[in-house]
């Protein structure tokens, strides 16, 4: 496993899903407004606030993008993904995953374990895992804003920190796919 710290937050911000941030986290929704009216709100209110809060987060070092990731030998058995010790013989951990319900439209009744080499095949596969964080300061700053009844800034900063964590996960998922040579059209 490796621990990584991303110093340049703009690289993480490039992966932010702005729709999820603006509409989901920040609640700037079109509602009954016309497309043009909504776009005007986004351009005049949302984007300047977004730019400002990102600059503040960088300047005050409120977000600390860190992650740990690694590649682990594995095999599958039914709905289980079996993580193996480095010796590739000893079971270290077993995860059981659900299968898509047959009655779900278009379902192929797949399970995550189906995408890994089976124990029965005798082949050893690799599974990557990664965990991300935007750091303790993000949580502390959010808590401080909330405690001080600064709900608007709390909502904006907390939303940015949540979506930044999602962006970091997406960014590193892309990196893992590249390292594994399965990035295709990423």
Predicted segments with their positions:
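Active-site loops and adjacent core secondary-structure elements that bind or stabilize anionic groups
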Residues: 1-155, 159, 180-182
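C-terminal amphipathic alpha-helical interaction region
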Residues: 123, 162, 166-167, 172-186
């Amino acid at each position: 496993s490796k621990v990584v710290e991303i110093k340049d937050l703009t690289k993480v911000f490039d992966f932010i899903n702005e729709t999820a941030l603006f509409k989901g986290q920040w609640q700037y929704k079109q509602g009954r407004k016309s497309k043009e009216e909504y776009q005007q709100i986004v351009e005049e209110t949302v984007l300047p606030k977004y730019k400002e809060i990102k600059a503040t987060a960088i300047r005050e070092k409120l977000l600390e993008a860190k992650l740990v990731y690694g590649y682990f030998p594995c095999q599958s058995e039914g709905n289980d993904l079996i993580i193996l010790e480095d010796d590739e013989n000893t079971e270290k951990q077993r995860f059981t995953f659900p299968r898509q319900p047959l009655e779900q439209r278009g379902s192929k009744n797949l399970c995550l374990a189906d995408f890994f080499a089976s124990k029965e095949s005798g082949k050893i596969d690799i599974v990557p895992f990664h965990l991300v964080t935007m750091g303790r300061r993000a949580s502390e700053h959010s808590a401080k804003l909330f405690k001080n009844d600064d709900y608007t800034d709390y909502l904006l900063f907390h939303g940015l920190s949540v979506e930044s964590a999602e962006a970091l996960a997406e960014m590193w998922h892309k990196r893992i796919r590249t390292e594994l040579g399965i990035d295709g059209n990423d």
